[in-house]
A protein has these predicted regions:
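An aromatic- and histidine-rich active-site surface loop
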Residues: 72-85, 89-117, 279
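Aromatic "clamp/platform" in nucleotide-sugar-dependent glycosyltransferases that forms part
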Residues: 275-276
């Protein structure tokens, strides 16, 4: 069965922003290769202006976020939904709910609505108490107005089952292992030096960037610490100002060249992953696929992916201890190998696309059967 599928809730593809854009890029192209007609909604501000990408139809909708800030996200999602109502999609896949679930009453009436439930957005410390309360409400609305649900983490799946008594489908993100060509392109001279630590994240408090850099700053390490991520926001400016006296810390900004990012991950002595909120994080999977040795913030999300194949820290003191004491020996090599095995057999993109396709087909069949039985269609 070939379906008409609309993917909403992202800023658009190809990815220039984050996790949902990343997975939408892979899943949409993968579904097209399997014969489905897929449309992805893009912000009109997206740098990719064509109406087609790798067989995926691109629909640009007006997005005033650049004019009015966060409120613009709600307007953008409303515009996407209003257009989707005209398209006669068999399935609408909503990537997240923070600014779309308030429009639940205008979700396309005859489409099967599937929502990827994101990663406990209301826990993010960057939000005020009022915003956190709204996000809890938005989560509740997403449960109410969706027919089916996807969780990208078993932790999220368990939370939704306990909180709302709903059964969501676990489908994680994916990552690609090195191709032979990519492996040949790695800078082996730099790899042999292994003279730097690495962190890649959005500059947000819940990513524990301050604790990581504070721990490194207080250490006696002679290595450099490279930080990848846009430092243009308020927190990013605070972080760069706080640590600008440490010549070992290098803020590299955002790097969108995936080959370069993967080489940096692969060549690092130790890769720090500080994310503490959310489901399966794409940058963590990419670090695993890039064969980096990983030190992760100690929380259920990271442990559900890495289990015993990483070092863990909870605060700056823990970071300092890792910076000063981690050695690259046989046990560490086994950690890297085990994580690569997880990418190959658990978090590979073909398996992820398989999961999305089979779940979408199952949901469409089930809902239409129910509608026939109840006389709704």
């Amino acid at each position: 069965m070939k379906l008409r599928i609309g993917i909403l809730g992202t800023r658009g593809i190809p990815n220039h922003y984050g996790g949902f854009e990343h997975i939408s890029e892979y899943v949409s192209a993968g579904l097209v290769k399997r014969g489905h007609a897929v449309t992805v909604y893009n912000s009109h501000n997206h740098p990719y202006t064509a109406s087609e990408w790798n067989g995926v139809t691109i629909k640009h909708c007006y997005d005033p976020e650049y004019l009015i800030g966060t409120a613009g996200q709600f307007v953008y999602d409303m515009n996407c939904l209003l257009d989707a109502r005209k398209q006669n999609f068999d399935v609408v896949l909503l990537m997240g709910y923070t600014s779309s679930s308030v429009w639940g009453k205008i979700y396309p009436k005859n489409s099967t609505i599937i929502t990827n439930m994101d990663g406990l957005e209301w826990k993010r410390t960057k939000y005020s108490k009022r915003v956190q309360q709204f996000l809890k409400y938005a989560e509740k609305l997403a449960v109410k107005y969706s027919h089916y649900y996807i969780s990208d983490s078993m932790v999220i799946r368990s939370y939704l089952a306990e909180k709302y008594a709903i059964n969501s489908q676990y489908i994680p993100y994916g990552a690609d292992v090195f191709t032979e060509v990519e492996r040949e392109q790695l800078d082996h001279a730099e790899a042999l030096n292994e003279d730097y630590f690495l962190l890649m994240a959005r500059m947000e408090p819940e990513n524990n960037i301050e604790a990581i850099l504070e721990g490194f700053n207080s250490s006696n390490s002679k290595r450099k610490f490279k930080v990848l991520g846009d430092t243009g926001n308020r927190f990013g400016k605070y972080i760069t100002n706080r640590f600008n006296n440490d010549d070992r810390i290098q803020f590299k900004g955002s790097i969108f060249d995936n080959t370069k990012v993967r080489a940096l991950q692969n060549n690092s002595y130790l890769y720090f992953h500080g994310h503490s909120v959310g489901g399966t994080n794409p940058s963590l999977l990419e670090a695993m696929a890039s064969e980096a040795l990983i030190a992760a913030h100690d929380n259920p999300f990271n442990k559900s992916v890495l289990s015993g194949d990483a070092f863990y820290f909870s605060n700056a003191a823990g970071v300092k201890d890792l910076v000063e004491n981690v050695q690259r020996k046989d046990m560490e090599k086994l950690m890297v190998s085990n994580n690569l095995h997880k990418i190959q057999y658990q978090f590979n993109w073909e398996k992820v696309i398989d999961g999305y396709e089979s779940f979408i087909l199952e949901c469409y069949d089930n809902l239409n059967y129910e509608r026939i039985i109840t006389g709704q269609r």
